[in-house]
Amino acid sequence: MSPMLQIAAEEMENPLIPPIPELVIGLIAFVIVFGFLAKKLLPNINKVLEERREAIEGGIEKAEAAQTEAQSVLEQYKAQLAEARHEAARLRQEAQEQGATLIAEMRAEGQRQREEIIAAGHAQIQADRKAAASALRQDVGKLATELAGKLVGESLEDHARQSRVIDRFLDELDDKATTAEATR
């Protein structure tokens, strides 16, 4: 072949289509590499992908379980908080009732003590009045006896006579005091 023909023949070959022997060798090499990868590498890849899928699904399940548990804990917390508020309100109400009862008891005790003090004061005043009246009666009786003895001119040493004169004199004084008060 002439060099020109050779160049023309080379030009006729399509550079995109490889020669058949290269195509066969490439195809055999591809099948060998693909077979090797399918036997050795593909199971490992599938295993890793399956583990990742299970881990992701397990993570999702764990997240859902954690969310459910968190929701449950939140509801328990809210229930406990509501119960604590109710208990606090009950204790506050109890304290107010006890305070009102204590105030009422203290007022009643104060009223009772006041009444006792007033009664004791009245009794003391009455006793003092009787003692003063008795002392006054004796003093007035002595003075009246002395005056009556001077006026009558006789001695009123006799106790019975002295008592009659004193009683009569005091009765006259009481009558005069009563009529003086009535005229006012």
Swiss-Prot record:
Keywords: ATP synthesis, Cell membrane, CF(0), Hydrogen ion transport, Ion transport, Membrane, Transmembrane, Transmembrane helix, Transport. GO terms for molecular function: proton-transporting ATP synthase activity, rotational mechanism. CDD domains: ATP-synt_Fo_b. It is found in: Cell membrane. One of its GO terms (cellular component) is plasma membrane. InterPro entries: ATP_synth_B-like_membr_sf, ATP_synth_b/b'su_bac/chlpt, ATP_synth_F0_bsu_bac, ATP_synthase_B_chain. The chain crosses the membrane at residues 16-36. Signal peptide: none annotated. It comes from the Bacteria. It holds the Pfam family ATP-synt_B. It is a single-pass membrane protein. F(1)F(0) ATP synthase produces ATP from ADP in the presence of a proton or sodium gradient. F-type ATPases consist of two structural domains, F(1) containing the extramembraneous catalytic core and F(0) containing the membrane proton channel, linked together by a central stalk and a peripheral stalk. During catalysis, ATP synthesis in the catalytic domain of F(1) is coupled via a rotary mechanism of the central stalk subunits to proton translocation. Belongs to the ATPase B chain family. HAMAP family: ATP_synth_b_bprime (MF_01398). F-type ATPases have 2 components, F(1) - the catalytic core - and F(0) - the membrane proton channel. F(1) has five subunits: alpha(3), beta(3), gamma(1), delta(1), epsilon(1). F(0) has three main subunits: a(1), b(2) and c(10-14). The alpha and beta chains form an alternating ring which encloses part of the gamma chain. F(1) is attached to F(0) by a central stalk formed by the gamma and epsilon chains, while a peripheral stalk is formed by the delta and b chains. This is ATP synthase subunit b.
